[in-house]
Amino acid sequence: MSAFENFGKRETVSDDRMECGICWHVYDPAEGDPVWQIPPGTPFSNLTEDWRCPNCDALQSKFMRLGDGR
């Protein structure tokens, strides 16, 4: 078991912003994602399984929860 196995896997809440660990793109639920036609107000946890980072095509598993400071 790796020390980093659960890194970034804390439970998220609906308004959590998520950051891509590859290109640092931030998914903000308040803004949605115009590239994937995701409407504002859509939590990261409600994105479809095929959604990927609009900048680098990374999987959702590569995203980490940002801290509470906005």
Curated annotation (Swiss-Prot):
Its cofactor is Fe(3+). Fe cation binds at residues 20, 23, 53, 56. One of its GO terms (molecular function) is iron ion binding. Residues 15-66 form the Rubredoxin-like domain. InterPro entries: Rubredoxin-like_dom (IPR024934), Rubredoxin_dom (IPR024935), Rubredoxin_ET (IPR050526), Rubredoxin_Fe_BS (IPR018527). Keywords: Electron transport, Iron, Metal-binding, Transport. It holds the Pfam family Rubredoxin. GO terms for biological process: alkane catabolic process. Binds 1 Fe(3+) ion per subunit. Belongs to the rubredoxin family. Could be an electron transport intermediate in hydrogen oxidation. This is Probable rubredoxin HupI. The gene is hupI.
